């Protein structure tokens, strides 16, 4: 499953200028932080809810399932005939079941009479039902029959309804599914655990003018005997698979199709009249399937793959085997009206979901503890795939900004969790669909791939997929296969990364010894609140690469740091050469250099001799060290000014994100405008070089960079940018000159931030007129930029209106919270005032966690952590408990950062104003 893109986390941190701060200072800061955490009850997660997995005495062999959805009254009828194996004599069968009413149930042992169930005991809290029988079911096989009814809900989970508008303007509904993690039980009674696999024979009774899809190809379509307006559609039997991967869709769709070079039928289903918008995803999918087949050396196991755009969809996409569901914005590309970033996103999401067809579907995690095996791996290999299809995207540099740093932000918190985390109750499972399972998982796999090399990695992946195909596996099984392929101690190394939370800070200092360079390395757990405080500091086995200015793109030495401290000698390094750790920013750690080593690296930023991904990593480490209180934020601002010649989009993107975090922090002060002046000074030179219009020879990354820079300058109030944005917006609205898709977001943001009620009304009109969901989302994401209190309230009210799809409400409210200090307060009040409606809308899924995170994490006053905690104590959100803890911790970290550095930042900005620096 691909989670929809979140706004950048407000939690960045790390590196070092000058000698380390006195340990006592760090200790005092850390202890005071942790005292505040403990006083608020935020230092540890609450006790886990009681949970038991299903008993093993009865298990399915095959589900024969027929569903008849009613698209007018939003109900469905179901008939299940499950071939089952009774492994231990029993008089009851326990299954998962939620929001379903069972009408009748019976069990017929093979060759014997049917036994009717005499009772259905629903355990609603545990989402289970116990079927009781009057006599003992003996060991052996038999058939379990259940007739049931359910509701096509509007919660975007289970078997639910999705609203769409026909080309003629009529509102209609499709019936669609979203079962991961634990919602197949809302469509039919089942053994809803990933390790309880079976085959499926699915039939759908649907209106004859509707499209019906499921995991497999259609094998029969015939009139339904009881109603001439209905047809019964039967699908081929699936391979052995987990319940969470079952899917069905009933609605009105067009499609485009092709065949991959391996002969697999590939279709992209789109809303009626928009088949053209499916062609880009179709092209990507047709390239991706053979790429994965060759990489894994395992063929795609189904005869077809459908990719379909769903109007109301909570996640970004879902990898159902053979029928992958997507948000419209994650699948559809309009050749004229889609921006470059949307094309890239579609390519990544398609690559992610198709990777799951092997890694997750063919071989499935044994339990949700190993979710990261699915999501971490897919989140890594999607980049490998896109790099293969679109090498011009420089996608691996973007990985560092999008995934690697995002994971480190979260994993530095006291309220993080290990990659492998014990989960039980469904509410706990929802919680781990986060940046640890996805982005940290992807980052440590990237590190592992680099450590053992591509050849042995591919060999190990083939061994793993071949051995466990159509079965389940745990993390240890993957390590064993990779260890056998590479001969390296994979389990010993990787257990330090997956079984304990956090990551190390590597401190390094250097000494020239004749013609060699002696490096002294030490590792300690990096903490967002400063130094680690505890009896036994965790240790990692860290693959470390070291490069020098002699050849910045090649590792001079690779080592495995398997102890707290070690010395390394680099042969033949001249005194004037710099030395850098973590070539390519591949190792999942932060680096803190001695002042002399760091000073030697800074010219490499100015003259671009450091590779882009290393410039990015160096800056990001510094910023994170400042957030943690290890260095002064002023030192980071000085380094940021060295990026005046920077040409790389992703480096600018990371700089922009960090300056955005700092701007949010300083919005709590009375010198917010001074940091905006700094932003304008840093971004003006690159803005002038780029201009507003594409130049001959420019490509994908230039388009991304132009939009980023103009948006940053416009938001900061850069006069020339603001004037040009207003001119182009006026021409766009009047139809004189339509804005290119790549310029719309920065222009919309700029005119709204510095506009009035008329500007907002025009934006809302553009939203209403937009035929394309990408354009609607583009507008929704910038509405929060408006500054006037009455307009902020208007945007918040709009967020819950019928004009905004349920899954997009979160980004509108989050945009308000991130737009200004007043917006943050207004958004928090709005959430509290409308909590019942919002919580019911998302039913405790991951969108509620996203909403909470985006809305409160930008606060920087200690008392707000207490207020947030108190609100959720009286308004429980079980699936967001960890997110709430993390948000409160971040609020305290922001407050500490502000108290510590605000005055020095202010003085530095005033000093710059008095005598602008020359760079």
UniProtKB/Swiss-Prot annotation:
Which GO molecular function annotation, any one, does this entry have? peptide binding
* UniProt effect for mutating residue 353 to Q: Reduces catalytic activity by 5,000-fold to 15,000-fold
| EC top class, as a word | hydrolase
Q: Map motif Nuclear localization signal onto the chain.
A: 726-730
Q: What is its EC number?
A: 3.4.11.14
Under catalytic activity, the entry for this protein gives:
Release of an N-terminal amino acid, preferentially alanine, from a wide range of peptides, amides and arylamides
Q: Cellular component GO terms, alphabetically?
A: cytoplasm; cytosol; extracellular exosome; extracellular space; membrane; nucleus
Residues bearing PTM 3'-nitrotyrosine: 464
Q: How is its activity regulated?
A: Strongly inhibited by bestatin, leuhistin, actinonin, amastatin, 1,10-phenanthroline, DFP, PCMBS, Zn(2+), Cd(2+), Co(2+), Cu(2+), Hg(2+), EDTA and puromycin. Not inhibited by PMSF, and only slightly inhibited by leupeptin and aprotinin. Activity is increased by Mg(2+) and Ca(2+).
Query: What tissue specificity does the UniProt entry give?
Result: Detected in liver, epithelium of renal tubules, epithelium of small and large intestine, gastric epithelial cells, and alveoli of the lung (at protein level).
* Cofactor binding, note field: Binds 1 zinc ion per subunit.
Task: Print the keywords alphabetically.
Answer: Aminopeptidase, Cytoplasm, Hydrolase, Metal-binding, Metalloprotease, Nitration, Nucleus, Protease, Zinc
Q: Per its Swiss-Prot or TrEMBL entry, what cofactor is needed?
A: Zn(2+)
The temperature profile of activity is:
Stable up to 40 degrees Celsius.
- Spell out the subcellular localization from the entry: Cytoplasm, Cytosol; Nucleus
Q: Which residues form the active site?
A: 353
* pH and activity: Optimum pH is 7.5. Stable from pH 5.0 to 8.0.
Quaternary structure, per UniProt, is: Monomer.
In which family does this protein belong, per the annotation? Belongs to the peptidase M1 family.
- Sum up the protein's function in the record's words: Aminopeptidase with broad substrate specificity for several peptides. Involved in proteolytic events essential for cell growth and viability. May act as regulator of neuropeptide activity. Plays a role in the antigen-processing pathway for MHC class I molecules. Involved in the N-terminal trimming of cytotoxic T-cell epitope precursors. Digests the poly-Q peptides found in many cellular proteins. Digests tau from normal brain more efficiently than tau from Alzheimer disease brain.
Record's PANTHER family?
PROTEASE M1 ZINC METALLOPROTEASE, PUROMYCIN-SENSITIVE AMINOPEPTIDASE-RELATED
**UniProt name for this protein:** Puromycin-sensitive aminopeptidase
From which source organism is this entry? Homo sapiens (Human)
Per the record, the gene is NPEPPS
């Amino acid at each position: 499953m691909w989670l929809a893109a979140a706004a950048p986390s407000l939690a960045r941190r790390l590196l070092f200028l000058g000698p380390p701060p006195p340990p006592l200072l760090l200790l005092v800061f850390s202890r005071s932080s942790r005292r505040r955490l403990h006083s608020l009850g935020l230092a540890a997660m609450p006790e886990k809810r009681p949970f038991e997995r299903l008993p093993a005495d009865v298990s399915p062999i095959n589900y024969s399932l027929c569903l008849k959805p009613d698209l007018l009254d939003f109900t469905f009828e179901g008939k299940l005939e499950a071939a089952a194996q009774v492994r231990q004599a029993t008089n009851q069968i326990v299954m998962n079941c939620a929001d379903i009413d069972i009408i009748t149930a019976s069990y017929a042992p093979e060759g014997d009479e049917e036994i009717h169930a005499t009772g259905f005991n629903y355990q609603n809290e545990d989402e289970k039902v116990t079927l009781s029988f009057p006599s003992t079911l003996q060991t052996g096989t038999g058939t379990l029959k259940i007739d049931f009814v359910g509701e096509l809900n509007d919660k975007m989970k289970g078997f639910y309804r999705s609203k769409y508008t026909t080309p003629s303007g009529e509102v209609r509904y499709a019936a669609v599914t979203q079962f991961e993690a634990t919602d197949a039980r809302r469509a039919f009674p089942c053994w809803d655990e990933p390790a309880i696999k079976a085959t499926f024979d699915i039939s759908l009774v649907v209106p004859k003018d509707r499209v019906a899809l499921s995991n497999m190809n259609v094998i029969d379509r015939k009139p339904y005997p009881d109603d001439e307006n209905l047809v019964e559609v039967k699908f081929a039997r699936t391979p052995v698979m987990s319940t969470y991967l079952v899917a069905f869709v009933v609605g009105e769709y067009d499609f485009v199709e092709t065949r991959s070079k391996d002969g697999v039928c590939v279709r992209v289903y789109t809303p009626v009249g928009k088949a053209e918008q499916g062609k880009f995803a179709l092209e990507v999918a047709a390239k991706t399937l053979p790429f994965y087949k060759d990489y894994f050396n395992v063929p795609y196991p189904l005869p077809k793959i459908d990719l379909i755009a769903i109007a109301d969809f909570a996640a970004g996409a879902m990898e159902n085997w053979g029928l992958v569901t997507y948000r419209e914005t994650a699948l559809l590309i309009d050749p004229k009206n889609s921006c470059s970033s949307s094309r890239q996103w579609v390519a990544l999401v398609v690559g992610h979901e198709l990777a799951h067809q092997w890694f997750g579907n063919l071989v499935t995690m044994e339990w949700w503890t190993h979710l990261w095996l699915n999501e971490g791996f897919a989140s890594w290999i999607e980049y490998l795939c896109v790099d293969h299809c679109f090498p011009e995207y420089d996608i691996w540099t973007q990985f560092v900004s999008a995934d690697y740093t995002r994971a480190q932000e979260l994993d530095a918190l006291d309220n993080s969790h290990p990659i492998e985390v014990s989960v039980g109750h469904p509410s706990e499972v929802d919680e781990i669909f986060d940046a640890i399972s996805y982005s940290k998982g992807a980052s440590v796999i990237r590190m592992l791939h680099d450590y053992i090399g591509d050849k042995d990695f591919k060999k190990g992946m083939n061994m793993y997929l071949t051995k466990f195909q159509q079965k389940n596996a745990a993390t240890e099984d993957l390590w064993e296969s990779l260890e056998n392929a590479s001969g390296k101690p994979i389990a010993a190394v990787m257990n330090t990364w997956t079984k304990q939370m956090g990551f190390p800070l590597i401190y390094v200092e250097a000494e020239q010894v004749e013609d060699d360079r002696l490096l002294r390395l030490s590792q300690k757990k990096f903490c967002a609140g400063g130094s680690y405080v505890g009896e036994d500091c965790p240790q990692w086995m860290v693959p470390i690469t070291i490069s020098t200015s002699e050849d910045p793109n090649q590792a001079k030495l690779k080592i495995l740091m398997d102890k707290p401290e070690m010395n390394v000698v680099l042969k033949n390094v001249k005194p004037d050469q710099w030395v850098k750790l973590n070539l390519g920013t591949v190792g999942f750690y932060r680096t803190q250099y001695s002042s002399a080593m760091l000073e030697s690296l800074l010219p490499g930023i100015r003259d671009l001799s450091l590779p882009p991904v290393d410039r990015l990593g160096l800056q990001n480490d510094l910023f994170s060290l400042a957030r943690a209180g290890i260095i002064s934020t002023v030192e980071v601002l000085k380094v940021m000014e060295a990026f005046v010649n920077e040409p790389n989009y992703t480096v600018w993107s990371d700089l922009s994100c960090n300056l955005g975090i700092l701007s949010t922090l300083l919005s709590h002060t009375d010198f917010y405008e001074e940091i905006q002046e700094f932003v304008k000074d840093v971004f003006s030179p690159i803005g002038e070089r780029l201009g507003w219009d594409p130049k001959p020879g420019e490509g994908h990354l230039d388009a991304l960079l132009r939009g980023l820079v103009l948006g940053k300058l416009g938001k900061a109030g850069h006069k020339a940018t603001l004037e040009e944005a207003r001119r182009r917006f006026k021409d766009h609205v009047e139809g004189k000159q339509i804005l290119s898709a790549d310029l719309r977001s920065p222009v919309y943001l700029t005119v709204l931030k510095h506009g009035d009620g008329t500007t907002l009304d025009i934006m809302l009109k553009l939203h209403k007129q937009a035929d394309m969901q990408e354009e609607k989302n583009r507008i929704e994401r910038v509405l929060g930029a408006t500054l006037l209190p009455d307009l902020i309230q208007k945007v918040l009210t709009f967020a819950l209106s019928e004009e905004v799809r349920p899954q997009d409400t979160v980004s509108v409210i989050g945009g308000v919270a991130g737009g200004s200090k007043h917006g943050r307060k207004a958004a928090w009040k709005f959430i509290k005032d409308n909590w019942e409606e919002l919580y019911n809308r998302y039913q405790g899924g991951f969108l509620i966690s996203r909403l909470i995170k985006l809305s409160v994490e930008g606060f920087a006053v200690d008392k707000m952590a207490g207020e947030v905690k108190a609100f959720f104590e009286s308004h429980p959100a079980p699936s967001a408990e960890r997110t709430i803890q993390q948000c409160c911790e971040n609020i305290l970290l922001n407050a500490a950062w502000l108290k510590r550095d605000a005055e020095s930042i202010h003085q530095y900005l005033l000093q710059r104003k008095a005598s602008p620096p020359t760079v």
